[in-house]
Each structure stands twice: as C-alpha cells, then as structure tokens.
C-alpha cells in the first residue's frame, strides 16, 4: 500500500495537473486506516519527477472510495486534486529450476526430467550445479534476480547460481561420464539412486547365479532392487563395490533359447549324389567321343587355334568337320562316323572276297596235270581255256558293280555323306587304324 503524504497547497499546480489529465474525473483518495475511522484525511503530494495516475474506478491498486466522506467535512480547498504515485504491481514469480547445460550430450529426451544430469555414475551427484538443501523461506523476486534461503541459513542468488552452473558445466562436461566410487552404506540416503540408470548385464560379473533364469519377459531392474536382493549393506568399507551404471536397460530374467537342431535328410542327399555322379559320367563319355571321332577332333583344334596335322586330314576320309561342339553335334557326328566305318568295312570285305576267288582259280589252274594233246583235242582244249578266260573277265565286272552302287539309308544331317567311295580310292596303308 503506498504511503500517502500531506496535501500540496496552491491552485496553480493543481490546475496544471488537471489540465494535463484532460477531462477525466478526479476522485479523492483516503488512507484505509484513517478513512475507515473517519478521523483524518491524507492527501497525495504531487512532484514533477514522478509518474502519476489519476485513479479511476477500475484501478485496483488503491482502496475503494469512501462514500462517507461527506460527513467528515471539508478538509481542504475544493480546487485541490489528490494523486498517488504509480507503482508497478508486484508479481511473485515461482523459482525456475536450474537447467543443466551439457554440450557433449545435448539429447535429454530419454530422461523424464530435463534437469536430471546425464551421468553414468551410480552414486548421488555431488555437484555445485544442483542445490539439494530444502528451502525454508519463500523466494523473493527482485528486478534482476531471485533470492532463496535454505534450512541451514544459506542464501542463494539466482544470477550467481546460474553463472556458477555455466562455469562448472563447461569445465566438467568432458569428465561427466567417469564413474564415481563411494561407499555402499552412503547410498541408502541418496535420493537420486532410485531414479538413476539401469545396471548393465555385463557389469554384474560374479552375481549371475543370484538372478533366476526364466523364459518369460519381466520388468526392468534398478540398482536399489539389486542392492536389496544381494544384501550389499553388510559388506565392509574395504570390500565396497561400485557398479557402472549405463543408460541401456537390461532384463531381470535372461531369456535362454535352445539351439535348433537341424536334421539331415539322408535320402535326399544320397539321391543328389547319385545324380551328380550320373551327370559327371555322361560328360566324361561325351568328352571321349570328342577326342576319338576325327571330325570332332579337327573341329576342336580349329576352335582352339591348334595345329592340324596331315594325319587328322587323312582320318577325315572325305567327311566334313563339325561346326559346333555341343552335345547334340557330338552325338550326330559320332553316328555319322560309325555309319562311315560300317560302309568302309563292307567295301573292304567284298574286295577281300574277290581277291580270294582270283587266287583260288589261279591256284587250281596251276595244279591241273599236263596231258598229251592231239590235234583235235588240243584245239578243243584251247577253245575251252579261252572261253573260261572270257567268262572270268565277264564275271569280274559283274562282281565289282555292287561295290560302286552300295547305298545306305542314312539321314543326311550336318553334312552326312552317302557311300560313294571307289574301291580304287581306298587307302590300305591306314587299315590298321580301324
């Protein structure tokens, strides 16, 4: 409540103020303590270096007008105006919790409280950035800072608190992930241990036997639950242990999956092996045909730019080399060569039979006994010999005629040739090759 002072005197000052305020209506203002009693009226002093406001009925910074002022009588000249200096309303702002600034780990969405530090230690955070004392008084807000008083009498200024926090956070951001080791007995009074991170499975070395195994899912386990289940309060200070807290959660019960045993199908595997052997055997036989048949052998040398010898050309015996070396061409040329060999064997057998007949006739003629001939008998014998020689000469062309006209019903595929070879063109020097 503003302190009202004595009224000022003089009509010139009052008139000038009234002229500045325009046509607004002035209202007399009284002190609440004196106006209610009706004993004294205190006017408002007007100075030039202050900001003033003509109190209207909608201004709640002053007490309501006293409608019983007419009974008090005239306390001053009617030309006096009553003003009160304008003061800004006082708004008590609630204290803003300190904001932790961590440049290294800027992402704090994983924490429920954005002001909670991103630390990897399991112990309470002993940091000047976080003041843990309880407040004993209501924080008072001024224009520039907020002052708070704690139970132990410490006074905290918001500006100094924020400045110290920024300096400390800039120096300690690099080492904030280091694990701090403290006694386990002091962890009972820690208020941040229950809200800390979760213990990782790998850090519980030596305590796996205490955790039961199950195949079902279960909630997460915290450091407090592990400490209470292991009875770590009874451990001496010399044997104190520290757990490295991580942000990654673990399961209280570990899921054990049995290894899958694969069955080997012996029947299917054996069938595949048999098919593979069968295919490899067929390929080997086809390769042998390619190396044996002259037409295929010459075609293989042409495809691979290998030299072709005169023996290869003689083995062709009038046949054309193959144009392709696929399985169908190899089988076709093999059939063609087999038919050619059959035809050649027949020709050779007929020639051998003809030679054997000639040698037999000449041998019989030489073995006949010589007899004395008379004139009549000698002439008859000469005629018989001449007739026999003529018959033999006539018989020889008739026996050679089928050798030139032997035809076989062989399909003319891929350059197959009919048997039109002459007995005069046969090479008996290469007969041993067949």
Swiss-Prot record:
Q: Which GO terms describe its biological process?
A: positive regulation of transcription by RNA polymerase II; pseudohyphal growth
**UniProt entry tagged with the keyword Transcription regulation:** yes
Where is it found, in Gene Ontology cellular component terms?
chromatin; nucleus
Tell me where it mainly resides. nucleus
Bias (Polar residues) occurs at 368-382, 402-423
**A Pfam match:** HLH
Q: Where can this protein be found?
A: Nucleus
Q: Where is the bHLH domain?
A: 266-341
Report keywords, A-Z: DNA-binding, Nucleus, Phosphoprotein, Transcription, Transcription regulation
Region (Disordered) residue ranges read 365-434
Keyword DNA-binding among record annotations: yes
Q: Which InterPro entries match?
A: bHLH_dom (IPR011598), HLH_DNA-bd_sf (IPR036638), Regulatory_TF_Diverse (IPR052099)
Protein function: Involved in exit from mitosis and pseudohyphal differentiation.
Self-association state and partner proteins as the record states: Interacts with the G1/S-specific cyclin PCL1.
Please identify the protein, giving its name as recorded. Probable transcription factor HMS1
Q: Give the species.
A: Saccharomyces cerevisiae (strain ATCC 204508 / S288c)
Q: What's the encoding gene here?
A: HMS1
């Amino acid at each position: 409540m503003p302190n009202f002072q004595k009224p000022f005197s003089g009509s010139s000052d009052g008139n000038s103020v009234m002229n500045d305020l325009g046509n607004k209506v002035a209202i007399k203002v009284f002190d609440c303590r004196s106006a209610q009693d009706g004993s004294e009226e205190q006017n408002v002093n007007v100075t030039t270096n202050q900001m003033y406001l003509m109190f209207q009925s909608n201004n709640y910074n002053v007490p309501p007008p006293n409608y019983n002022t007419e009974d008090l009588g005239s306390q001053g000249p009617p030309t006096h105006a009553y003003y009160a200096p304008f003061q800004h309303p006082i708004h008590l702002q609630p204290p803003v919790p300190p904001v932790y600034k961590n440049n290294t780990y800027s992402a704090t969405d994983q924490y429920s409280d954005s002001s909670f530090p991103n630390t990897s230690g399991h112990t309470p955070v002993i940091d000047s950035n976080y003041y843990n004392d309880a407040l004993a008084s209501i924080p008072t807000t001024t224009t520039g800072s907020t002052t708070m008083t704690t139970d132990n009498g410490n006074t905290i200024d918001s500006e100094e608190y924020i400045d110290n926090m920024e300096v400390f956070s800039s120096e300690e951001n690099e080492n904030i992930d280091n694990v701090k080791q403290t006694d386990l007995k002091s962890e009972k009074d820690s208020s941040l241990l229950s809200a800390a991170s979760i213990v990782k499975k790998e850090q519980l070395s030596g305590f796996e036997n205490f955790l039961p195994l199950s195949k079902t899912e279960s909630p997460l386990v915290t450091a407090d639950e592990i400490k209470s289940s292991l009875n770590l309060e009874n451990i001496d200070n010399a044997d104190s242990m520290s757990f490295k807290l991580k942000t990654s959660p673990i399961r209280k019960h570990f899921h054990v999956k049995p290894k899958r045993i694969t069955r080997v199908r012996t029947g299917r595997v054996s069938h595949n092996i048999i098919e593979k052997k069968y295919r490899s055997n067929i390929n080997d036989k086809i390769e042998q045909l390619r190396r044996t048949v002259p037409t295929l052998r010459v075609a293989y040398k042409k495809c691979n730019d290998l030299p072709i010898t005169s023996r290869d050309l003689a083995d062709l015996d009038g046949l054309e080399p193959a144009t392709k070396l696929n399985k169908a061409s190899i089988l076709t040329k093999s059939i063609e060569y087999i038919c050619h060999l059959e035809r050649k064997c027949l020709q050779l057998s007929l020639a051998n039979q003809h030679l054997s007949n000639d040698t037999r006739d000449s041998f019989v003629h030489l073995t006949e006994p010589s007899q004395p001939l008379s004139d009549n008998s000698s002439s008859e014998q000469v005629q018989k010999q001449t007739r026999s020689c003529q018959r033999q000469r006539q018989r020889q062309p008739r026996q050679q005629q089928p050798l030139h006209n032997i035809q076989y019903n062989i399909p003319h595929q891929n350059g197959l040739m009919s048997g039109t070879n002459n007995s005069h063109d046969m090479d008996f020097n290469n007969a041993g090759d067949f």
